[in-house]
């Protein structure tokens, strides 16, 4: 590994309590802002193609099946990259690993705007998926390193809103730019923004607290649950930690299976929602994308409620809140599907409620994976469940396009409603577990 990409060594420990407190407060705030901004732009360059899809479809460059194929290719590549990058990021310098990944996705988005053939689109979008995997595992590692167990839900939820801000803005920006200059210019604008923010990441981000002379966060906050996780698995090699706390951890596997189904719903609404609005209500691209943006707005609020609730109502136990939100997904998807009349306002409201409930488990499952694993394997654990999440998301691409061709929108909503129902059942074992990892170890 290039020397600047290696995780920095521990710096001499600062002994002055006031300086430790001041540095912790400063860097916790700045790191959260930086990873939030960075991940919003990762999401911006991830969803740029989806936002432009109706315009590309109308131009005749790609068919509906082609768009579904590209979505499936992206999700599979991204899922694999997320897992591999999670393992690598646990040993890498966070600031450069995440920053370089974002710059690379920006370059790929710009090149996509110059492309004309399906093969070029497929190659570039797979390459974009690969570099997209550099983002989320780094964020999970930093959130685990800088925020302790009993407060992490709220902070993780704040970071998670970057998904929603990026996801809500890109349809609006893409639609506005495409309306005046074409979808190709929209892809280039997204790419240029990503390159600029990627440079900011390389400048402002930092690695774990020990790298700048601070004690571990559990010691600083006197958080017993956090200290217990910090001390667990002492003396194990990285390979042993990966095997014991990730690959052979039954709770990680259960969370992974649930993530598959949650992401079927999330990706289906995200990727096909604007087309559904265009075809069923006959609205234009800007109006359709505005409704899809309500999905992200609902997710913004839902993630905050889920994180706050799991901290304050259930003392850091993610299980009960996960189950409540999974049941809400089923109800909101059913409302969107079975609405007895065509109303743009009501459809947009259903997009909002679906987003509200989807982004609870979307955020909490990743956090639960980090907390069910080892402190030094947070990136690998979230990357592993992320692999399964995007295998689920890949089902919303080409396979769901085929469902649409045969059974139309009725089949589409039946599939995602079933996925929502099963996901709720898979979360039942976590309902009464304060710390599934500790139960497993006992």
UniProtKB/Swiss-Prot annotation:
Pfam families recorded: MFS_1
InterPro entries for this protein: MFS (IPR011701), MFS_dom (IPR020846), MFS_trans_sf (IPR036259), OPA_Antiporter (IPR051337), Sugar-P_transporter_CS (IPR021159), Sugar_P_transporter (IPR000849)
Major localisation: membrane
Membrane topology: Multi-pass membrane protein
BP GO terms, sorted: glucose-6-phosphate transport; phosphate ion transmembrane transport
Periplasmic side: 52-66, 119-121, 184, 266-289, 344-347, 401-410
Localization per Swiss-Prot or TrEMBL: Cell inner membrane
CDD domains from the UniProt entry: MFS_UhpC (cd17488)
Gene3D superfamilies in the cross-refs: MFS general substrate transporter like domains
Cellular-component GO terms for this entry: plasma membrane
Topology, Cytoplasmic side: 1-30, 88-95, 145-162, 206-244, 311-322, 369-379, 432-442
Residues that span the membrane, as ranges: 31-51, 67-87, 96-118, 122-144, 163-183, 185-205, 245-265, 290-310, 323-343, 348-368, 380-400, 411-431
Keywords in alphabetical order: Cell inner membrane, Cell membrane, Membrane, Transmembrane, Transmembrane helix
NCBIfam families (alphabetical): 2A0104, PRK11663.1
Similarity comment: family membership: Belongs to the major facilitator superfamily. Organophosphate:Pi antiporter (OPA) (TC 2.A.1.4) family.
Role this protein plays: Part of the UhpABC signaling cascade that controls the expression of the hexose phosphate transporter UhpT. UhpC senses external glucose-6-phosphate and interacts with the histidine kinase UhpB, leading to the stimulation of the autokinase activity of UhpB.
Name this polypeptide is given: Membrane sensor protein UhpC
Species: Salmonella typhimurium (strain LT2 / SGSC1412 / ATCC 700720)
Organism placement in taxonomy: Bacteria, Pseudomonadati, Pseudomonadota, Gammaproteobacteria, Enterobacterales
Gene encoding the protein: uhpC
